[in-house]
Regions:
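Acyl-thioester-dependent acyl-group transfer interface
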Residues: 2-185
């Protein structure tokens, strides 16, 4: 990767811990972590730590604490003496201004590795366009439908041949790749 460390981030639906599980509005908190890399680091070397971080962060107490931290930031922005259009722009910048800048994002609702569920199908339909935060070099959206995991990756650095490189990396980890395609947007 040409880096000594990478940051990864993910967001979680917090409607359950806020006591409004059926609310029709967006209620999320975002987490970020850093992984130190060595010259020959492989995904298998650190994925169990990533999994442990995610499981710990998705506990109700952690989600409430992070949601409170983020709401405090929103309140501070709202208290600024600035025109509404400036405040709206700050809100639109979201996690970038909030300090959650990452090399890649894990984005999902529930468990992306479960078989197709109505909730997951609705999520992928509602959020079929996903843009990584400004400052991120690439963004990753992962979903699972009928046992097939789909990764949509936006390569903001516009590095040619990324699909082929990703295929090679996955196959080195013994992961079958059905298709890897560079799409123009």
């Amino acid at each position: 990767l040409g880096k000594e460390k990478i940051q990864y981030s993910y967001s979680s639906d917090t409607r359950d811990v806020a006591g409004v599980p059926n609310a029709l509005y967006n209620c999320v908190c975002s987490f970020e972590h850093t992984v130190q890399l060595q010259a020959q680091t492989r995904l298998a070397d650190f994925i169990s730590d990533v999994d442990a971080d995610i499981k710990r962060d998705l506990q109700p107490q952690s989600k409430r604490r992070r949601m409170t931290e983020q709401m405090g930031w929103v309140y501070k922005v709202n208290q600024q003496k600035a025109p509404l259009r400036i405040k709206q722009r700050v809100f639109q910048m979201g996690e970038y201004i909030g300090g959650t800048i990452s090399d890649f994002w894990l984005s999902y609702l529930g468990n992306p590795l479960l078989p197709a569920t109505q909730e997951l199908q609705k999520y992928t339909k509602d959020f079929n366009v996903w843009v990584p935060p400004d400052g991120g070099s690439m963004g990753v959206e992962a979903s699972s439908l009928n046992g097939i995991i789909t990764l949509c990756i936006e390569n903001k650095a516009e590095m040619p041949g990324l699909a082929g490189m990703i295929r090679t990396a996955f196959e080195k980890e013994d992961i079958t790749v059905l298709e890897a395609v560079d799409l123009d947007t």
